[in-house]
Curated annotation (Swiss-Prot):
Domains: entry comment: Putative ligand binding domain (NR LBD) may be dispensable for import into nuclei and in the development of neurons that control movement.
Major site of localization recorded for this protein: nucleus
Lineage summary: Eukaryota, Metazoa, Ecdysozoa, Nematoda, Chromadorea
Region (Disordered): 211-238
Keyword Zinc-finger: yes
Protein keywords: Cell projection, Cytoplasm, DNA-binding, Metal-binding, Nucleus, Receptor, Transcription, Transcription regulation, Zinc, Zinc-finger
Naturally occurring in which organism (per UniProt): Caenorhabditis elegans
Chain's role: Orphan nuclear receptor that binds DNA containing an extended core motif half-site sequence 5'-ANGTCA-3'. Required for locomotion, neuron axon pathfinding, and regulation of expression of some peptide neurotransmitter precursors and of NMDA glutamate receptor genes. Involved in specifying interneuron identity, in concert with paired-like homeodomain unc-42. Plays a role in recognition of the PVPR and PVQL axons by the AVKR and HSNL growth cones.
Protein name listed in UniProt: Nuclear hormone receptor family member fax-1
UniProt-annotated location(s): Nucleus; Cell projection, Axon; Cytoplasm
Record-stated family: Belongs to the nuclear hormone receptor family.
Biased composition (Basic and acidic residues): 226-236
SUPFAM superfamilies hit by this protein: Glucocorticoid receptor-like (DNA-binding domain), Nuclear receptor ligand-binding domain
SMART domains in the record: ZnF_C4
Amino acid sequence: MSDEDEPLNFSTSKATEESKEGILGVRSIFNTPLLFPPPMFNAGVISPHIAAALAMSFNQQRMNASVSPPLDHTTISVNSFPSMGSVKTDSPPTASSPTLCCAVCGDVSSGKHYGILACNGCSGFFKRSVRRRLIYRCQAGTGNCVVDKAHRNQCQACRLKKCLNKGMNKDAVQNERQPRNTATIRPALDMDPQNFFREYAGAVSAIMGHSNMMKREDSPSSASDGKTEDEKKDSLQETTMSQLESVLQWAQQFRLFTVLTNSEKRQIILTQWPRLLCISLCEQAEDVSFDDHLTSLMLKFRRLDVSPAEFNCLKAITIFMKRELSLWRAGWDNRASIITVYPAGERGARLVAAALLLAEHSVMGFGNCVIPLALVFSTKSRYVIQRHAINSLPACVPGGTSAHPVLRCSMGSRREKVI
């Protein structure tokens, strides 16, 4: 026996036959799990091979025990859960049940959606959450809110959590396809005033770096036929709240907005949220039934054929079109400049263009930009969108338990005027 095979303890007898069999088993350590028979430890000796194997086994167990930190149950997104191949989910109701119920909220199921029986409301909510990579925070702060037919819209975080726990497969949600009528390659742009807005919008999209490419349906209510009134109401509430949160998140990521002071940001949001919500709804509304006034406004945008990059341009201009603010162009050309943005009008739009493109683009006229801006900034449009927000989001009206801070501050003194 060589020196490296000598036992570590010379005060006891040789290893038993069972120990020898255990030592032979160590040779397969890299192919199978390491198992040590109990008689091995009664022999009073341990070989260096076994010592090394034990150390490796304990190290492997410690690595397996070092799992990721527990989920924050108050903040939920689809990325909070692993893929379906590595997670055990609650068993959804089988299709042989006499009454097909949604596994998430218990409403009547329209069939299997993303792997489980679900209603149109929950399947649509799950699809939007996955496609837009939305992050929700539990309203109650517990992560255990009741999710049923009557309360499914009260806490989006707990609803998404239950969708995933019940077995909805986020990998089954397909990426959105661009509509055929906008998928064609556009010809090269010249400096004609009619084409300048599209060229400018592309530059703004590049500056912002996060153009939202959500699809737009031909008609905002064309896909809502066949839905029950409850489903239409749920879809309306979800879409409105989702678009409001989405456009506010967009503003927080807009680089020219982030350099403003907190008081300036607050004043902009309180003043411009109806217009920003209007643009967002016109851009991203899906199979939702709106009232006649808002539907008419959205159809006007459809006829203008506004592209996603142009919608981003409109949102950027809308932020700075109402009040006199000091707009810092920080970090461009290694210096900071102050540009004063004047109230709404073509002159204000030109100045916003200068603020966005001064670093590397020439300041030019807006051309077709004035038309959609006039729609968004009209007094009628503001009241229409405020009335829509109040009617579709009753829980956010002042006095509600889950009042949205933006709506609570901005609609509190205007509700009597717009209803």
